[in-house]
């Protein structure tokens, strides 16, 4: 009997089949505002020729910035680094009134690539100022978008960064206050902050707590929540200075997953995948799809098993923003 079983096994060797799954979040990657900003630089380069100056990174992604730099874009920190009269593009994050005034004083030919949803927050803040509200800005200190929004009103804006700030912030006129937010915040964190403010200041001008958080930020966070139920680990493609990418990584951790923020395939560590069957992969709003494929290829390269890639069910985004007039055909 033993010899017959042995012969059978030799004739039909036992094959143990392992499979690793990668589930791609949907939606992921570029949002309409990022697409518009990048296309603005590319169209300006094509229409006017290099160099084209850009104040700050056009979007928070080194891969995108380097690709545009190779085409002739020059990125600077402040407008006083730009030659008088040069073509200048403002980044998707928006700028303050002071930056606009300094640009005008230097005679710069400005093309504004500010995301329209950020511009909407600017208008909202100005409206509150005109109506004599004390303004709270919920956001991250030092973020370009926060600096731009706070610099759009002449009175001091009160920055609230977290729940502790919301509990301790002092308001001179609690009978007339309003709030605006950065567009790339955590939806859940923002709701908690607004709830605290509402309890402390019942007369605060209220709207939907997440009224200023952009559609793409909400959609990508919702996708990660759904994805977290299907995977053992989460990889988020995005830059360290990308607010929305960091929030996706944080959300993955809150959902109980080992979660890593990476720039691309070169950051993938094989040790992350020990005893892992299913990998969740998403990308922040400034990360191009080519980096998603780069990470997938890296996982396939280091995997000792077959890798099957699929997209999760999710919404299809159809939002589109027209380009600035100066770069339209």
Label every PLM stretch briefly:
Residues 5-8:
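Acidic, Ala/Val/Gly-enriched low-complexity intrinsically disordered segments
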Residues 11-12:
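Cationic, low-complexity basic patches in intrinsically disordered or flexible, solvent-exposed regions
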